[in-house]
Each structure stands twice: as structure tokens, then as C-alpha cells.
Amino acid sequence: MNSLAIETQEPRAQAITINEDSLSVDLMDGRTIIAPLIWYPRLWYGTAEERNNFEIIGDGALIHWHDLDEDLSVGGILAGRRSGESQKSLKKWLEERRTRNL
């Protein structure tokens, strides 16, 4: 009996583009993922400058936004997972932002 093992690799980001409506992730294997920015409220509420201040870490497996305290896994984006942040947590974060920006 033969068994065929399919080798899979964790998706890895090569480049990120963010506009007012979407997050686009170019993968190392040539694919591009595009997700609505509204799925990630901290990115949605962040300024263009904050959204564009990101770092691809973990050999391309994660994207980190220091200014927004946000981390997304490339695998999660590919799987269509939205932010799991609670409304209570998001509300607190937004209030803290308003206080800092006064």
C-alpha cells in the first residue's frame, strides 16, 4: 500500500500593501491575499502612517504593527480569520487613543 504525503508549508509574507479599505499580502509562493481592512479594527482605526509602520517577522509568518499593538498571522489572514478582539477591548483601546491624542 502506498501513501502519498502532501508537503505543506506555512504561508510566508514577502510584501504588504495597505490602503484605506484593504490589506494585501504578497506571499513568497507567488500568491496574493487581499482582506477587507474592517476585519482588523485596529488597522481600520489607525492612521495611514500607523498602518504603514509594520514589520514582517517570524520569517514572514507574522505581521506586527508596533504603533497599533496589533499582530496578524499570515496563515490566519489566508484562512479568512477576522480579528478576535472583543468589543470591550477595542472600546478601551479607542478611548486610550483619544486620551493620548488630546
At which residue positions do the language-model features occur?
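Motif-centric detector for short Cys/His coordination patterns
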Residues: M1-L102
